[in-house]
């Protein structure tokens, strides 16, 4: 399974420098940046690159990392070709709590590491997670448009993105149990998350 996160932000220097910057950065570097930025109360970050390395500066922290020779995916084509006929609205806080509890059980699941079964039916989500010795079932209320659906998704992947959502409502757009899922903050059209179901 794979995932893609798209975030659009306005840059202060974007008017001065019209040149586009497209870089692939190691995931470990991004994870490190996120962890450090959560500890520091700083909203401004300086990013510079010569193409082979990227320099980040914020507060009194400086990070230099290499870039990866990997073409950025054509996310617009992926999103434009994604078809969805089901829309699920969930309370972000409740959904996050359910995902966190389920993640404890599914992290060592031998059949599908971090895999949970998401059953959307009658304006409810029943989330089931299984470990070697135990099973958890969590149910929360949803607003559901379209038919019922049962799908297996990576709980950890969802948790990583949904923990960044600031709005009260999380939106899931789905088609079937083999097609892509789009996750977004109802109040933020500049960020969305794309993931595939588990086999």
Task: Please annotate each region the language model reported.
Residues 1-6, 14-68, 83-199:
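DNA polymerase processivity clamps
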Residues 75-77:
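Specificity-determining recognition surfaces
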